[in-house]
Amino acid sequence: MIILAIESSCDETGVGIAELSEDGTVTLLADEVASSVDEHARFGGVVPEIASRAHLEALGPTMRRALDTAGVGRPDVVAATIGPGLAGALLVGVAAAKAYSAAWQVPFYGVNHLGGHLAADVYDHGPLPESVGLLVSGGHTHLLHVRSLGEPIIELGSTVDDAAGEAYDKVARLLGLGYPGGKVLDDLARQGDREAIVFPRGMTGPRDDPFAFSFSGLKTAVARYVESHPEASQADVAAGFQEAVADVLTRKAVRAAETLGVSTLLIAGGVAANSRLRELAEQRCAEAGLTLRIPRPRLCTDNGAMIASFAAHLIAAGAPPSPLEAASDPGLPVVRSQVA
């Protein structure tokens, strides 16, 4: 079965094509992405209207490249991110997917963007066993219990304020590093001393929810430090901030796996590309005897391949197609795998 999937939840226009074999194996055939990030950079963040217009312009050419790469004429299924995400951006991808579904007379699946991030790892490491999932991106930070990609995902905890990726962008802006801030801040942090400045770790007290996160206080602490220490090394500030984020994320994720008695930790989402998070997760999983799975950096960021993978797992589990009347949902919770 050939599955074509569209991703348009934010500022990446992605088209992925995957093959679902009879034994449940999912093979990636094409992964094409067009980004409008440069158009948003001068505004210091994503502008929803610009993102929607960019999807309209990029979707056709990206679709053609994906079909050519895969050598596919007509897929057996069309899928799309139906939420969460920017309302206008989602509408572009969902409307296109429905149109292709109707024109090709094949089923349509509207699936969850966040589940897609988890499913991306399958391309690199094969079938996913029962896992604790740490999903970290610009708009989301969740701890999840993933029994399988075809079953409902259970949320263990999430951020009570800023997402981890959002904190990265805000601190990068504070340091004058521009937007998007994730990679440039990561690069700067590698030049600094992560022990030189110790920033607070939110939600880590004995009375705090062990599976909840908070990064607003950390962001404020960095701002106050920079204001009161104008001579401070930017590299040390970046390293101290990054260490605080990676410390909290990995500490809570490993604790969740140990609490549930699960032997695999999956880290996914855009922030999963961060070098220190990957390094510290590897160290702590080794100490705890856990298997760590993180997709290659390209599959951590938004793409259509991950949506194709998640749709494939839902189909293999017997999920019904979504009706063409299904509406996109900008606030779709992670526990809803699809809109059916």
From Swiss-Prot:
Q: How is the cofactor bound?
A: Binds 1 Fe(2+) ion per subunit.
Main localisation? cytoplasm
Q: Which Gene3D superfamilies match?
A: 3.30.420.40
- What does the record list as GO biological process? tRNA threonylcarbamoyladenosine modification
Q: Where in the cell is it found?
A: Cytoplasm
Q: Which Pfam families match?
A: TsaD
E.C. number(s) listed in UniProt: 2.3.1.234
One example of the protein's molecular function in GO is: N(6)-L-threonylcarbamoyladenine synthase activity
Cofactor(s) named in the record:
Fe(2+)
Which PROSITE patterns does UniProt cross-reference here?
GLYCOPROTEASE
Q: Does the keyword Iron apply?
A: yes
- The chain's coiled-coil residues are none
Residues that coordinate or bind substrate: 135-139, 169, 182, 186, 274
Q: Source organism's superkingdom?
A: Bacteria
Query: Keywords, A to Z?
Result: Acyltransferase, Cytoplasm, Iron, Metal-binding, Transferase, tRNA processing
What does UniProt give as GO cellular component? cytoplasm
Q: Which reaction does it catalyse?
A: L-threonylcarbamoyladenylate + adenosine(37) in tRNA = N(6)-L-threonylcarbamoyladenosine(37) in tRNA + AMP + H(+)
Keyword check for Metal-binding: yes
Q: Which residues bind Fe cation?
A: 113, 117, 302
Q: What function is annotated for this protein? A: Required for the formation of a threonylcarbamoyl group on adenosine at position 37 (t(6)A37) in tRNAs that read codons beginning with adenine. Is involved in the transfer of the threonylcarbamoyl moiety of threonylcarbamoyl-AMP (TC-AMP) to the N6 group of A37, together with TsaE and TsaB. TsaD likely plays a direct catalytic role in this reaction.
Similarity annotation: Belongs to the KAE1 / TsaD family.
Q: Which HAMAP family match?
A: TsaD
Q: What is this protein called?
A: tRNA N6-adenosine threonylcarbamoyltransferase
Q: Which gene encodes it?
A: tsaD
